Amino acid sequence: MAKDFRDITLALAGICQASRLVQQIAYQGNADEKDVEVMVNSIFNINPTSTLDVYSNQISHLKLGFQTIKAIHQAVRREKLTFELMTYQQGLINLERIINKNNDYSSHLSQKISQLERQKNYFEPLSDGLFNALAGVYSDAVSPVGPKIQVNGSIELLKNPIIQAKVRGLLLTGLRSAVLWRQVGGRRFDFLLHQKTILRQTDDFLAQC
């Protein structure tokens, strides 16, 4: 069956957007709330009608993700921030593979997300309480299963418990997109083997943002 690179690129943009937001929070302590909200909402969209529906049916909601795909491709590999983004992206894809291959891991994560979905109305959107809850899911159901994603940033910021919670919460949103990436046919080496196709599709999406 032929790969649908439209859907694959959308899911990859979700992974990259989450990775970039993690980086922004870790270095700056803040990020665009609309970009963050799109990613947080994606976790609770358990039964989407399409790939784009995961991101509220708006291509523009993934603009940062498309820009990040381009940045990763265009930058020199030795550039520190770009290397970090590549590390986060691949780390999320690898973690998802480990979880997907183990029924206990995947069931535990699904249960935690379902439980949080039932409780989400008790939290204000993007509140510290919500991020603490998201971080709790990540720490309980994701961190123990495989190699930890080492996040770089401001040492002082990363000592802050709410910054830590936001980083873990956003990594969880990236894992949601990594699940989607696999479901639509994405594979670990697609960005290398089908780079031109993905970049062309990325340019098409950016033109619509």
From Swiss-Prot:
A Pfam family that the UniProt record links to this protein: DUF489
Cross-referenced InterPro entries: HflD, HflD-like_sf
Subcellular location as annotated: Cytoplasm; Cell inner membrane
The keyword Transferase appears for this protein: no
Gene3D superfamilies attached to this UniProt entry: HflD-like
Membrane topology listed for this record: Peripheral membrane protein
Keywords for the protein's UniProt record, in alphabetical order: Cell inner membrane, Cell membrane, Cytoplasm, Membrane
PANTHER family per record: HIGH FREQUENCY LYSOGENIZATION PROTEIN HFLD (PTHR38100:SF1)
NCBIfam families: PRK00218.1-2, PRK00218.1-4
Protein name: High frequency lysogenization protein HflD homolog
Annotated organism of origin: Proteus mirabilis (strain HI4320)
Gene (UniProt): hflD
